[in-house]
């Protein structure tokens, strides 16, 4: 769905583990890494699109994750001119995204990048929380920064809790 301003409705998905690290995925056959994301189909809610994209891109089902939060509003980014398809109607000049923060509840083995038979990613890894903001392609950086800042209040306590648990476990009597 492309709105009257030329922005395609899209969902972004950030999956975190119990340590507050986030899943970072490499686009199939490329050297670029990003969070899973995808378009919202006509008649589909943002949450429905998120679950569909979650399965298509990383093979996870609703029972594998827990929704921790979502962005309060839709965030937009413009595509660089070289990526805008002028011959398509309506012309899409960028994405407007509703972001979801999910916690992985199942084992990592549930992640299957080839679940749909048409992989969008060919590798993934856990990275520190702020790492993606510095590493994503430049035209998505501002949206990533806003999303990560909004979600930090939810995710960073996971890191603090785990860090405290590790310290307690390392004490010697």
UniProtKB/Swiss-Prot annotation:
InterPro entries from the UniProt entry: Nudix_hydrolase, NUDIX_hydrolase-like_dom_sf, NUDIX_hydrolase_CS, NUDIX_hydrolase_dom, RppH
A molecular function GO annotation: mRNA 5'-diphosphatase activity
Top enzyme class: hydrolase
Domain Nudix hydrolase stretches: 6-149
Motif placement: Nudix box: 38-59
Pfam families, A to Z: NUDIX
Keywords of this entry: Hydrolase
GO terms under cellular component: cytoplasm
Domain of life: Bacteria
Protein EC: 3.6.1.-
One GO-annotated biological process of the protein: mRNA catabolic process
Cofactors required: a divalent metal cation
Family of this protein: Belongs to the Nudix hydrolase family. RppH subfamily.
HAMAP family recorded: Nudix_RppH
Function: Accelerates the degradation of transcripts by removing pyrophosphate from the 5'-end of triphosphorylated RNA, leading to a more labile monophosphorylated state that can stimulate subsequent ribonuclease cleavage.
PANTHER family in the cross-refs: M7GPPPN-MRNA HYDROLASE
Protein name (record): RNA pyrophosphohydrolase
């Amino acid at each position: 769905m492309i709105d009257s301003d030329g922005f395609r409705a899209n969902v972004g998905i950030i999956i975190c583990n119990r340590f507050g690290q986030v899943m970072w995925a490499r686009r199939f056959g490329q050297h670029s890494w990003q969070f899973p994301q995808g378009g919202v189909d006509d008649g589909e809610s943002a949450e429905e699109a998120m679950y569909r994209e979650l399965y298509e891109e990383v093979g996870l089902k609703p029972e594998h994750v827990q929704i921790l939060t979502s962005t309060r509003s839709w965030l937009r980014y413009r595509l660089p001119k070289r990526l805008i398809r002028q011959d398509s109607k309506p012309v899409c000049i960028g994405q407007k995204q509703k972001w979801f923060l999910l916690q992985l509840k199942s084992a990592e083995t549930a992640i299957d990048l080839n679940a749909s038979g048409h992989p969008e990613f060919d590798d993934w890894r856990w990275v520190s929380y702020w790492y993606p903001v510095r590493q994503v392609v430049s035209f998505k950086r501002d949206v990533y920064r806003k999303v990560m800042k909004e979600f930090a209040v939810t995710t960073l306590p996971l890191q603090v809790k785990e860090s405290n648990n590790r310290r307690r476990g390392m004490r010697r009597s």
